[in-house]
Amino acid sequence: MAIRARSWRPPPPPLLLLLLWVTGQAAPVAGLGLGSDSELQIERRFVPEECPRTVRSGDFVRYHYVGTFPDGQKFDSSYDRDSTFNVFVGKGQLIAGMDQALVGMCVNERRFVKIPPKLAYGSDGVSGVIPPDSVLHFDVLLMDIWNSEDQVQIHTYFKPPSCPRTIQVSDFVRYHYNGTFLDGTLFDSSHNRMKTYDTYVGIGWLIPGMDKGLLGMCVGEKRIITIPPFLAYGEDGDGKDIPGQASLVFDVALLDLHNPKDGISIENKVVPENCERRSQSGDFLRYHYNGTLLDGTFFDSSYSRNRTFDTYIGQGYVIPGIDEGLLGVCIGEKRRIVVPPHLGYGEEGRGNIPGSAVLVFDIHVIDFHNPSDSISITSHYKPPDCSVLSKKGDYLKYHYNASLLDGTLLDSTWNLGKTYNIVLGFGQVVLGMDMGLREMCVGEKRTVIIPPHLGYGEAGVDGEVPGSAVLVFDIELLELVAGLPEGYMFVWNGEVSANLFEEIDKDGDGEVLLEEFSEYIHAQVASGKGKLAPGFDAEMIVKNMFTNQDRNGDGKVTAEEFKLKDQETKHDEL
């Protein structure tokens, strides 16, 4: 049920001295003392173990009773009306014997009371109901006590060690509760609905006692709030489950707290000493996170998926609170971002995130880049003689360690015990590496940082390189073999023989077969007269050269077909 405020009226004026109904129901009575039928007698048939409060003169009580004569004949019962008897004690609103008998009772205590005529209805009796000079017996069960001077009572039975913030007026809260009467009878529970009660505090959305009882609570705190009826639903009750003049007891556990004026809060957990760059709007981030509610309830984690969350920031791809909270982070930084619901998933929530929930994200930034980034090169060592620099077409042998920006090692040629060998500028490595190996001399050591759009992109390499990852390569160039001029796969180191075809055609039949051609080219390379492009399959180069000369494709080259490159620009051979 909703704990909403109702219009409140002060306690009613005193009841009549003799509480009689036209229906013939007499006011319940009880007494205090022992002795004969001429004295008030009380038998305490049940006393609860805990009795924090007893009835005093001036208190207002709610109790059930059964009234009988000594022979057992019933003359009245509150149970028959399915309603407690509600009255002030010690103010003359009851017969004297009952006024005395109720004093000292505990809630849930049961008393059997014998009231002599002089403390009941005396020699007059009640016409048609109670004969003159009747001894009256009452079986009384006390349900409720309060006093018009009572205030809200608060008992905190659990308080978390850390309490950075407490409920203030105008805060919005989410809490669970069990609502009972003073006798322990449950009338409502948010737990049964499996949904928190969500409301503003101190602006009249709640009954006055709850508005007051919630103030000062911490998230995670548990407290008992006891509310007298004039700060709850008053003399009329709520018209459904709560009777009039009922004291209410709420066992409250606070789960969440925020104010509509709140922004995000950021707590830096780990900030690297070296932070050369901080994230800005438009950057693309890869980060891990654990997501919890304010009370610690887990709702999501990138770690459980074994994959970072990858997104642009500052462009509306994530909730506003995270968009803001990820600005200004360093690579490797860990921070806690607390996001109020109006900067999170709002009143509706999403999935297992309830509506109006404050969210807590523990973030670990793995890397970030900007789509406009190029590679970054830092040279750590250059030999004294660093005049021959790598260029397109050169054949390179180098060692490297490949890692992510957070230091996670991906690959290492040193661990494999062999160099990595490529021809520069022929797409044998990712574009960023190709760029990073340019203008490098043998013996040089450098670090190349490659953004994903110049590396392995959004897809990455399954099981090896995460998607959208910035890569860091520590490189040492060990060997450089100069390449050939662009467009050539073979060049002569000296003058070309005027009788080149005849030299290749050793058998003099006027036709050169692939075997003859291959043997001749390899002989020229071996003698230093010619040079094949380094880093490529020599046989494939020779075969391509032969194919280019074999213009009719009959598997042999004639003198008519044979041309040098400078004689036939359409072909790359020789």
UniProtKB/Swiss-Prot annotation:
InterPro entries: EF-hand-dom_pair, EF_Hand_1_Ca_BS, EF_hand_dom, FKBP-like_isomerase, PPIase_dom_sf, PPIase_FKBP_dom. GO terms for biological process: protein folding. Phosphorylated. GO terms for cellular component: endoplasmic reticulum. It is found in: Endoplasmic reticulum. It is an enzyme of class 5 (isomerase). Keywords: Calcium, Endoplasmic reticulum, Glycoprotein, Isomerase, Metal-binding, Repeat, Rotamase, Signal. PROSITE patterns: EF_HAND_1, EF_HAND_2, ER_TARGET, FKBP_PPIASE. A motif (Prevents secretion from ER) lies at residues 571-574. Inhibited by FK506. This is Peptidyl-prolyl cis-trans isomerase FKBP9. The lineage of its organism: Eukaryota, Metazoa, Chordata, Craniata, Vertebrata. The gene is FKBP9.
